[in-house]
Design a protein with these regions (language model features):
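Glycine/tyrosine- and acidic-biased, solvent-exposed loop/turn segments at the edges of beta-strands
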Residues: 1-122
């Protein structure tokens, strides 16, 4: 993915209206980079490409990709101590494919498969 250009802001500099993000006091959908606790890129007011979110401690909280404002592909989430909590897969914002959840000690808690946002095999 090439550089989308635009400016660099924090999420606090943006407002969301009907699923589209705008820089405060403007009517133009935001295109540019977001820095701070949550980091990634907006294209035409929607999250696009790789995003990361950090706990206030600076440890990684969540990482994955967005496509046209929707979670898409593999996502991982972590607890405040940095322990992996889940591996999830999305397609167009819906749960799709394998999901795995872990206990605080790293042991497997649960796993399953999703299709069209619904868990299969239940």
């Amino acid at each position: 993915m090439g550089d989308l250009g635009g400016e660099e802001v924090t999420l606090d500099d943006l407002v969301e209206r009907e699923g589209i993000h705008y820089k405060k006091f403007t009517d133009v959908p935001f295109t540019g980079k977001v820095t701070g606790q949550e980091q990634g890129t907006f294209k035409n007011g929607k999250k696009e490409g790789p995003w990361v979110d950090y706990w206030s401690s600076g440890r990684l909280r969540e990482k994955g990709d967005y496509k046209n404002g929707q979670k898409d592909g593999s996502w991982e989430s972590y607890d405040p101590k940095g322990q992996l909590r889940s591996k999830e897969t999305f397609e167009n914002g819906e749960k799709e494919g394998p999901w795995v959840f872990y206990w605080d000690n790293g042991q497997l808690l649960d796993k399953g498969d999703y299709k069209n946002g619904k868990r299969e095999g239940l």
